[in-house]
């Protein structure tokens, strides 16, 4: 990558995340449901500490990455009223490090390139439900993705030992039903990134991989883009996180009947509880890529948003 373009990429992602960080989600555990360390991409995390005592607050980063949702964690720190912005990827893995190199706060970088996953960052020093704020921006020139979003707030005081006092507890998320739509395949390619959540505290405390699991069902029907239903049941198992495509929710016959013009599927996720992995819901993210047939300047752009639950 040319240095000038790389600097522009970094500036764009940093500017987006620093702007978005002001007044965004606040809690002592923040969940960021999607990051990437793909070659040439930058995922940039921005955190701020609104606590005033003590001056330096311990942070616990828990990365969950790859098909196996592998656990990687370490401790960082954040001084009072500071803004810490840094690349998710370590400099050795293609990241640029801290936005301000002289910042005395200590981030935890992810050491591997070409990975995707989700991240939980928790405050460990101050027993407060609003000391930690944060957001993430992602710029990926290969896929065309440019997005900034706030971390998801669990509103629990998470001080103390790792995994205790509500750290990683997202059992309040009980989203199970999602009406998923797909635009015509000739103009947009659609994928979904599902993250299974629940109370992850015990798993975090043990330093183990989160194995929250369950199955998606299409509830026996899918619809084409003109409301015609086609029956057939598909069950899709998911453990921790998964990238899903529209055909994961359809039989071969249903997919052929719906055709290339897009459609609707009303999915339901059924959690499977096996202690200490106790899932309660799903965070579903939709990723749409505009295809070359659309033409410039839109072709090659990628859009990401969190899907709203409810049927």
Per-region residue spans from a language model:
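Hydrophobic helical h-region of N-terminal Sec-dependent signal peptides
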Residues: 10-18
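Positively charged n-region of N-terminal signal peptides that target proteins for export
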Residues: 1-7
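Gly/Pro-rich, tryptophan- and cysteine-flecked surface segments typical
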Residues: 4, 14, 23-311
């Amino acid at each position: 990558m040319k240095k000038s373009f790389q600097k522009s990429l970094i500036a764009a992602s940093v500017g987006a995340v620093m702007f978005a960080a002001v007044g965004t989600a606040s809690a002592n555990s923040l969940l960021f449901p999607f990051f990437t360390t793909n070659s040439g991409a930058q995922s940039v995390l921005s955190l701020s500490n609104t606590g005033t005592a003590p001056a330096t607050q311990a942070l616990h980063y828990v990365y969950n990455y790859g098909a196996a949702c592998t656990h990687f964690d370490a401790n960082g720190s954040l001084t009072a009223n500071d803004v810490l912005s840094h690349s998710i990827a370590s400099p050795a893995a293609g990241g640029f490090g801290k936005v301000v190199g002289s910042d005395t706060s200590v981030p935890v970088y992810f050491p591997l390139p070409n990975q995707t996953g989700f991240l939980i960052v928790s405050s460990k020093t101050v027993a407060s439900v609003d000391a930690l704020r944060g957001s993430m921006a992602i710029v990926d020139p290969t896929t065309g993705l440019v997005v900034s979003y706030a971390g998801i707030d669990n509103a629990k005081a998470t001080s103390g030992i790792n995994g205790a006092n509500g750290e990683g507890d997202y059992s309040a998320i009980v989203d199970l039903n999602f009406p998923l739509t797909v635009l015509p395949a000739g103009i947009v390619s659609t994928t979904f990134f599902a993250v299974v959540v629940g109370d992850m505290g015990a798993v975090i405390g043990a330093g183990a991989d989160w194995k929250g699991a369950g199955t998606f069902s299409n509830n026996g029907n899918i619809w084409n883009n003109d409301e015609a239903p086609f029956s057939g049941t598909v069950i899709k198992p998911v453990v921790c996180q998964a990238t899903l495509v529209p055909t994961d929710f359809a039989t071969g016959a249903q997919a052929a009947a719906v055709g290339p013009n897009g459609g609707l599927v009303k999915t339901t996720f059924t959690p499977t509880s096996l202690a200490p992995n106790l899932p309660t819901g799903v965070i579903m993210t939709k990723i749409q890529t505009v295809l070359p047939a659309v033409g410039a300047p839109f072709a090659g752009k990628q859009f990401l948003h969190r899907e709203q639950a409810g049927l």
